[in-house]
C-alpha cells in the first residue's frame, strides 16, 4: 500500500434516525416518564433509560456518547423511526470527507460487513482486523434548537444543535489491531490515531497500545502523528492512552466538550482570556508540540509556530461547515463554495482578539456562517479532521 495518509483505528455502522418529535413524545408517554426523572444516565440498561438519557442531553443542549447494555435496545428504539445506515468512526468519516475533494487514504478497520464494503470510498485501501463479519450499530440522535419535546406540563427545547451516540460495539471494545499495520505505515506522511475510547478492559487497552507503538516504528522519521480525542467511557483510560502516546504525537486535537471535560468546568468560548488560560492549563496536562481545538465558533492551533497550521485549519473549518450545512451528500463544488463563505461574526471577533494575545503561539480562524435550520450535527469533528489532514501533506 502506498497511501501517504493513513487513518486508524476503528469503524462502525451508524443508525442515523430521522427525528420526529411526535413519535418521541409518544414514547415518553408510553413509558410514563415524568419531568422529575430527567437526569444524566450512566450505562443505559433499558429503552426507558435511553429515552430519559436523550431528554437529559436535549435539556442541557449537550452532546455525548453513552454505552448501552445491549444492541437490542438500539434495534428496538430505532424501529419507531425512519433511519439511514451510514459509516461511523472518525477515521472512516474523515476518509469519506477527504475523498470528496480528491484525496485518498488507507484505513485500519475493526469491523467488516456488506454495509462497510458498500459505503467505503472506492479509492480507499484498507486492512481489517475482524476475524469474522459483524454489525454492532451505533444509534445517532441529532437535535436542533427547533426540536421541542413536551414532558408532562414542561417543554424541553435544546439551547443549541448537537448529537448523541449510543452503542455497544464489541469490535471497538476489543480494538483488535491487524499485524499488517506495520506495512500500512511504511510510506505514511500523516497517521491519524483515534478510537480507543470504547475499550473497557485495562490490560487489553495496554496490550493494544504496545502493539500500536511497535507498528509505529515503521513510520518514516518525518511522518506526522495526529491524535483525535474522544469521549471515553472510562475516564482513567483516557489518561492511560495519553501517558503512552504523548511522546509520539505531534498534534493533539479535541472539540469543545472534550476541552471542558479536561478543564472541569463550562468555558465561555467567546472570552479570549478565559480560553487562553484554559489552553495553558490543558497544555500542562497534554504537553505536545501543538494542540488543535475545534468548536462551534472557531478552530485554533496552540503551540510553537502555530501559524504553520493555518491552511489545515481553514480546510478543517470548511469541511466541517460543509457537512453541517449539507450532510453526507455534499459535493466538491459545495466544499469550494463553503470555502468562500463569510465567517461567523462572533467567531471572527474572538479570533482577532486571541491571535493578538499570543502571537506566534496561537493561530485561530472563525467558523463560517451557516443559518440553515435543518443541519447535520453528527460527524462534524470527523469532517474537520478530513479537511485538516490533506493540507498537512499536499
Which positions does each model-derived feature cover?
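Ribokinase/PfkB-type carbohydrate-kinase core domain
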Residues: 1-375, 393
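Catalytic tyrosine of NAD(P)H-dependent dehydrogenase/reductases that use a Tyr as the general acid/base
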Residues: 378
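Active-site-proximal C-terminal subdomain of hydrolase catalytic domains
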Residues: 388
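Conserved single-residue anchors adjacent to enzymatic active/cofactor-binding motifs
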Residues: 381
